[in-house]
């Protein structure tokens, strides 16, 4: 019994000791996280602010750090200039609560201050993104979802995770144009626009905040204006909310309708395939009780409708895209590789180009582009001439090989040739138009979306340009106008290609009847484009610098009168190859030398712009003659491949894989700027131009664009190509 009492006594003593230890630990833990009002409830925070308010609304007492905050923090400066005459009572009250919360170091108010933008370093080289943190502003409104153990000592105020603002806050961005002489002005797009992110009370309207900002920058309180002579001017403000008008846009309805109609046709094509593969084809498409399917069944029993619907057969179209077969006689396999590689190459350039409006070291980005190592990226626009050369070659080559059509042109009268010309134009438009128009509608929607929700100032507002100038794109004449007024301005080359197609067909029709006249017109066109290029280049003082290239874009870069040169060179090469029976009669060793020489000239033309301040005459000479030489090297590759010769690198370009990629090249060309611009604009922070990171980003964009191109090609390109073949030959074109 005594032993039992002894053990009870010992256990009781240990329990008391343990309880004391727990209390001490809890007390210590509470001490570690106890920072007076900082860790109190929201009511306590509000009480502190209220008591501070009662100490005097107009008190002249100023804390030591208050002048610094006024001049360095835009959000704090706005709280100081706010009064009852320039903002609503609720906005005024909430801004003053923010001000006093910052001065009394309330955690929620410090988070507001921290989430709002201030000037970062790098202004001289283009850092205009004072965005603060959108996520941190959201953290002011609601506790951050993170679990931290209290068993470890921390120096932080624990309530910065838990304490919320006593009223609604939201993140907005205000845009100011500056005129500072202390920032490198490149004159490529609109770079002198400050982006200032502000975590503001929701009670403050955008117009009120804009007026407060005007008062703040005009009051000499903006320290950065004193240092960098910014002379800021308020442009506009975004609340980063999607406009209610977005879903009312005509393009939204048209794109949705196109998707629904295409989807319905694909479903019908699939049902048709199932019925044809069934044991009893007369069974029909659907159960008897479904009136909709019965109506569809009766409609699809008509042979013309079946042929039309079969153009949208997803399985067949995928087989055509993915097919990789042996090269057929008369085909020129190197064209697949040239188109595919150049499409990805141009995509790489667009990654850099559309990075420009989100990068905060623009000067260094262009500096990298001028370095020798990165010339292959910065001169990628020259590769558009590869497509023009191939188009000119194929247009002439196919026309001259089609003896039946050639004879028809010779025998037809004027009206007969006009009808034939219209037929060719219709089929060209049918193959190119649907995907192009859907992408154009998608561009309008995408830029309307990012114009509302992106933190970045979007220089090229295609959602404003497309509703005004859509008809130019529909007619493929957008490149005849100012390049800054284009809807989807990267489509200028598609307009050029359509215009060259029309002109080439006119000359070829003339050639069928009067060969000498057609040859004279072709040579005259060649001389005219060279003369025009020299004249316009000298007049506009053209240089290879990026600012000069951008500002002379309408006169030179997108002008069909300048860009027609490689198309003519390709057409002449095709005429020599087809009509003159041009053959490569030389030794294998010499043939290899010419192949390698063509590659060296090709690369040399790419790197010819490494020095960009050579003077106008030398620059325009390099531009014109270099492009002519560049096109000749492409023609050599095409003719050499058609003749069956080649070397190791040309055999790589003739690989079967490029057949697949070539079928997607049109979609890749149309989609890559849209995808790249959309992804960049939806980020919440600016990025730095870093060569290694850029290479990784290029790989990522290549995969995304490739997958998007498959989807768009299956839906909006291949079905209409099948339809064109159906109308021409009576059945869809097979692989």
What are these regions (language model features)?
Residues 252-262, 335-342, 381-384, 388-390, ...:
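Transmembrane alpha-helical segments and their boundary/interface "anchor" motifs
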Residues 192, 240-257, 297-303, 330-336, ...:
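Interfacial loop-to-helix transition and helix-capping segments at the boundaries
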Residues 201, 501-527, 576-593:
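Solvent-exposed interhelical
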């Amino acid at each position: 019994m005594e032993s039992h009492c002894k053990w009870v006594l010992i256990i009781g003593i240990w329990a008391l000791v343990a309880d004391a230890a727990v209390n001490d630990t809890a007390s210590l833990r509470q001490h570690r996280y106890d920072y007076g009002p900082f860790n109190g409830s929201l009511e306590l925070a509000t009480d502190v602010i209220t008591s501070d308010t009662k100490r005097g609304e107009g008190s002249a007492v100023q804390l030591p750090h208050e002048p610094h905050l006024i001049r360095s923090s835009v959000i704090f400066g706005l709280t100081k200039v706010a009064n009852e005459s320039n903002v609503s009572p609720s906005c005024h009250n909430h801004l003053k609560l923010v001000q006093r919360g910052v001065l009394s170091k309330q955690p929620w108010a410090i988070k507001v201050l921290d989430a709002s933008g201030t000037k970062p370093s790098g202004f001289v080289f283009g850092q205009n993104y004072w965005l603060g943190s959108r996520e941190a502003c959201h953290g002011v409104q609601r506790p951050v979802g993170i679990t931290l153990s209290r068993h470890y000592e921390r120096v932080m105020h624990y309530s910065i995770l838990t304490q919320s603002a006593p009223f609604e806050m939201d993140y907005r961005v205000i845009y100011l144009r500056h005129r500072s002489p202390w920032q490198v002005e490149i004159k490529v797009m609109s770079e002198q626009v400050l982006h200032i992110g502000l975590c503001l009370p929701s009670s403050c309207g955008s117009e009120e905040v804009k007026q407060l900002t005007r008062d703040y920058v005009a009051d000499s309180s903006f320290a950065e204006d004193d240092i960098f002579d910014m002379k800021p001017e308020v442009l506009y403000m975004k609340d980063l909310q999607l406009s209610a008008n977005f879903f009312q846009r005509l393009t939204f309805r048209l794109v949705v309708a196109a998707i629904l109609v295409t989807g319905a046709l694909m479903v019908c094509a699939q049902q048709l395939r199932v019925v044809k593969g069934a044991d009893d084809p007369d069974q029909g498409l659907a159960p008897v009780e479904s009136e909709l399917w019965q109506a569809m069944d009766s409609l699809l029993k008509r042979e013309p409708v079946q042929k039309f619907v079969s153009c949208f057969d997803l399985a067949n179209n995928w087989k055509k895209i993915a097919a990789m077969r042996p090269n057929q006689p008369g085909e020129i396999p190197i064209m697949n590789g040239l188109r595919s590689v150049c499409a990805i190459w141009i995509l790489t350039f667009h990654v850099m180009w559309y990075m420009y409006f989100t990068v905060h070291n623009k000067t260094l980005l262009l500096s990298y582009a001028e370095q020798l190592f990165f010339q292959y990226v910065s001169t990628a626009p020259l590769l558009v001439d590869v497509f023009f050369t191939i188009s000119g070659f194929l247009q002439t080559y196919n026309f001259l090989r089609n003896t039946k059509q050639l004879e028809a042109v010779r025998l037809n009268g004027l009206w007969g040739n006009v009808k034939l010309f219209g037929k060719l134009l219709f089929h060209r438009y049918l193959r190119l138009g649907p995907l192009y128009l859907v992408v154009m509608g998608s561009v309008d929607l995408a830029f309307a979306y990012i114009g509302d929700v992106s933190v970045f100032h979007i220089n090229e507002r295609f959602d404003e340009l497309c509703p005004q100038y859509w008809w130019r794109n529909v007619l493929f004449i957008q490149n005849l106008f100012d390049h800054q007024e284009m809807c989807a301005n990267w489509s200028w080359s598609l307009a050029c290609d359509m215009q060259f197609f029309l002109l080439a067909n006119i000359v070829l029709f003339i050639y069928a009847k009067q060969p000498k006249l057609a040859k004279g017109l072709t040579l005259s066109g060649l001389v005219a484009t060279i003369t025009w290029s020299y004249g316009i280049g000298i007049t506009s003082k053209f240089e290879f610098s990026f600012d000069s290239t951008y500002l002379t874009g309408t006169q030179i870069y997108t002008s069909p009168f300048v860009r027609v040169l490689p198309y003519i060179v390709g057409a002449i090469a095709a005429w020599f190859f087809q009509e003159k029976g041009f053959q490569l009669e030389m030794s294998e060793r010499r043939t290899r030398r010419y192949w390698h020489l063509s590659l060296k000239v090709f690369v040399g033309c790419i790197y010819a712009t490494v020095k960009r301040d050579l003077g106008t005459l030398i620059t325009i000479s390099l531009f014109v003659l270099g492009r002519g030489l560049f096109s000749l090297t492409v023609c050599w590759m095409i003719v050499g491949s058609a003749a069956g010769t080649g070397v190791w690198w040309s055999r790589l370009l003739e690989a079967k894989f490029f057949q697949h990629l070539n079928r997607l090249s049109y979609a890749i060309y149309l989609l890559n700027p849209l995808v790249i611009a959309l992804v960049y604009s939806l980020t919440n922070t600016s990025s730095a131009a870093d060569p290694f990171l850029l290479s990784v980003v290029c790989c990522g964009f290549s995969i995304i664009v490739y997958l998007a191109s498959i989807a768009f090609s299956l839906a909006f390109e291949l079905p209409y190509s099948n339809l064109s073949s159906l109308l021409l030959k009576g059945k869809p074109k097979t692989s």
